[in-house]
């Protein structure tokens, strides 16, 4: 079994991928790419492209071909057997697919028509959306945002290795907090951290999150607070508002020498248990040795059981993922204990427990209501309400 506690963790698959073309070669490659068939990428595919290119999705070197796709959907493994739980695919229409052959090189462009990468087409194949939805999202209900996105995709998937011509350095969100995997790994080494726990969130950090993070921090050297700032649901708190709330919280309530705030610029899939495994693998590539998995991780609505995201890790052999999941129950504020707790540490009945869901708190914030201090630090609430007022104004 891999002892991640005492080693510099190896990237998933053994090598940290870098698919960026050297700067000196980019202009020539762009000019050549201008003559190629072109595929325009939406926000999610652009995000995936960036994650592939910088190594966050190691060992992927491009969008998945048929063998990897089918293996991931059916078995949560790449074709070579390596654990991987979410399909990373590029879809096109049937008409677009007829404009190139397997073996051709195509240009990948953003919404403004700028060529950002090229791809050598290794595979073109059709797929069963409903089958993917059932296995990956556990539902075919198009009210589920991940399923809805899947059913909006083109009819043909295109797989192949990518070469980035634009690594996004001039357009990256929150550049102060943007770190590539190799950069975060260097920071962890510089700080002397051998055991690093990662925490994923798309919500403001509330007292339950703070309790979980600090409980984990008691057992490791450092905490990576790694909020997702890619594509999310329309009713999620905007990333710029959340980021300010994280800054305030870390400045006032966390040890600065044991925490790092860095954005995770991936798109949210809302795939629940499967996405929990996927998020753990991504944090392994960033250099984390441990990853926090809370209640209904990456869930939405009532599609997943409260602790399904814990149980899915049992489907892998101990040490096989190469990162240690830390499972936490739903934390609450106990009026009798006078602090945060879980059912593992609190003897009192539910009448004394104060629970707040992210959905309920978002509603309160948008209505200008102040959630009680049992939910979140007052400074954080001020930032959130102020930010939402400015957005709506």
From Swiss-Prot:
GO terms for molecular function: ATP binding; sulfate adenylyltransferase (ATP) activity. The keyword RNA-binding does not apply. It comes from the Bacteria. Signal peptide: none annotated. It catalyses: sulfate + ATP + H(+) = adenosine 5'-phosphosulfate + diphosphate. Keywords: ATP-binding, Nucleotide-binding, Nucleotidyltransferase, Transferase. One of its GO terms (biological process) is sulfate assimilation. Its EC number is 2.7.7.4. Gene3D superfamilies: HUPs, Sulfate adenylyltransferase. Pfam families: ATP-sulfurylase (PF01747), PUA_2 (PF14306). Pathway: Sulfur metabolism; hydrogen sulfide biosynthesis; sulfite from sulfate: step 1/3. Belongs to the sulfate adenylyltransferase family. HAMAP family: Sulf_adenylyltr. This is Sulfate adenylyltransferase.
């Amino acid at each position: 079994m891999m002892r991640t506690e005492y080693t510099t963790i190896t990237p998933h698959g053994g090598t940290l991928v870098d698919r960026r073309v050297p700067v000196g070669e980019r202009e020539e490659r762009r000019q050549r790419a201008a003559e190629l068939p072109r595929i325009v990428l939406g926000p999610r595919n652009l995000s995936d492209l960036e994650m592939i290119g910088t190594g966050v999705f190691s060992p992927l070197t491009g969008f998945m071909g048929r063998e990897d796709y089918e293996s991931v959907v059916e078995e949560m493994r790449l074709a070579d057997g390596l654990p991987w739980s979410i399909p990373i695919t590029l879809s096109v229409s049937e008409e677009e697919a007829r404009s190139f052959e397997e073996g051709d090189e195509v240009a990948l462009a953003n919404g403004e028509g700028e060529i950002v990468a090229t791809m050598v087409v290794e595979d073109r194949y059709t797929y069963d959306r409903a089958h993917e939805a059932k296995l990956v999202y556990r539902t075919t209900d198009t009210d589920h945002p991940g399923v809805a996105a899947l059913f909006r995709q083109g009819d043909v998937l295109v797989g192949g290795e990518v070469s980035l011509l634009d690594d996004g350095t001039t357009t990256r969100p929150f550049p102060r907090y943007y770190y590539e995997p190799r950069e975060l790994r260097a920071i962890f080494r510089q700080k002397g951290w051998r055991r690093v726990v990662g925490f994923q969130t798309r919500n403001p950090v509330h007292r339950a999150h703070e309790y979980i993070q600090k409980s984990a921090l008691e057992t490791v050297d450092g905490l990576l607070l790694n909020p997702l700032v890619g594509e999310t649901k329309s009713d999620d708190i905007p990333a710029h508002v959340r980021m300010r709330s994280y800054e305030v919280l870390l400045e006032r309530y966390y040890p600065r020498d044991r925490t790092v705030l860095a954005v995770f610029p991936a798109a949210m899939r809302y795939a629940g248990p499967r996405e929990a495994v996927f998020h753990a693998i991504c944090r392994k590539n960033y250099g984390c040795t441990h990853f926090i998995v809370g209640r209904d991780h990456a869930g939405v609505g009532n599609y997943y059981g409260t602790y399904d995201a814990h149980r899915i890790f049992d489907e892998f052999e101990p040490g096989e993922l190469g990162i240690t999941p830390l499972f936490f129950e739903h934390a609450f504020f106990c009026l009798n204990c006078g602090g945060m707790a879980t059912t593992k540490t609190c003897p009192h009945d539910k009448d004394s427990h104060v629970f707040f869901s992210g959905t309920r708190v978002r509603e309160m914030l948008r209505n200008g209501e102040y959630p009680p201090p049992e939910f979140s630090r007052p400074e954080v609430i001020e930032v959130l309400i102020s930010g939402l007022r400015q957005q709506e104004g």
